[in-house]
Amino acid sequence: MWVGVISLFPEMFRSVTDFGVTSQAIKKGLLSIETWNPRDFTQDKHRTVDDRPYGGGPGMLMMVQPLRDAITAAREAAPGKTKVIYLSPQGRTLNQAGVEELATNENLVLICGRYEGVDERIIQSEVDEEWSIGDFVLTGGELPAMTLIDSVSRFVPGVLGDFASAEEDSFADGLLDCPHYTRPEVLDGKEVPSVLKSGNHKDIARWRMKQSLGRTWLRRPELLGNLALTDEQELLLAEFVREEHQQSK
């Protein structure tokens, strides 16, 4: 996967390129990230990238010319057909389904806004999709872009050592993940559930599904309304709820 990033602060993306799974993916040639700074495309000695909005109001907007030229440069550098994304509070909220959808693209250009945003005509003429990471305000689009890169790259074949890791993550099947345990077997008097030490893979899978359903019911019940549970899942959830009520008495 190739990702081009348009940002006034390209140095921020070193946290993606130099560390963790994404860094390893870059070293393996599975992921490529390039950055373009609109300041490098300005036409004045002050390298101006912002201007006042028509109609007045607080703040400034990113100027059209430097931003458009940066987008053009990124498009031309892309190895193939490219989808251009603007990280925006007005965009579609990113979730696991959206991540998997975006992961089907081989090339992405991500535009990171600053100030009060960008000229609407840039969105109309240059942007294919707008995406948001939530209903809250950030100072720029860099953190959302890094979030998108991190989440999408997990679905690039070979990026994760075990692709099942991505398939079993929280939200991969619409549910929260189940609890996980490692050594020591007993910690502060709390033991690892015996089923996980049994070696019975069928029982372990059943326990994990039950815990996943139960955790979703406890913490994000609205997610269950979007799922068509199997008969077995319905039974496991009912069993979890019953046990939870018994423990709370």
UniProtKB/Swiss-Prot annotation:
Q: Which reaction does it catalyse?
A: guanosine(37) in tRNA + S-adenosyl-L-methionine = N(1)-methylguanosine(37) in tRNA + S-adenosyl-L-homocysteine + H(+)
Give one GO term, molecular function aspect: tRNA (guanine(37)-N1)-methyltransferase activity
Write the Enzyme Commission number(s) for this entry.
2.1.1.228
Q: Which UniProt keywords apply?
A: Cytoplasm, Methyltransferase, S-adenosyl-L-methionine, Transferase, tRNA processing
GO cellular component terms, semicolon-separated: cytosol
**SUPFAM superfamilies referenced in this protein's UniProt entry, alphabetically:** alpha/beta knot
**Location in the cell:** Cytoplasm
Q: What class of enzyme is it?
A: transferase
Q: What does the entry list as the binding residues for S-adenosyl-L-methionine?
A: 113, 133-138
InterPro entries linked? Alpha/beta_knot_MTases, tRNA_m1G_MeTrfase_C_sf, tRNA_m1G_MeTrfase_TrmD, tRNA_m1G_MTases_N, tRNA_MeTrfase_TRMD/TRM10
Q: How does it assemble?
A: Homodimer.
Q: Which family does it belong to?
A: Belongs to the RNA methyltransferase TrmD family.
Q: What does this protein do?
A: Specifically methylates guanosine-37 in various tRNAs.
Name the chain's protein.
tRNA (guanine-N(1)-)-methyltransferase
The protein's organism comes out as Aliivibrio salmonicida (strain LFI1238) (Vibrio salmonicida (strain LFI1238))
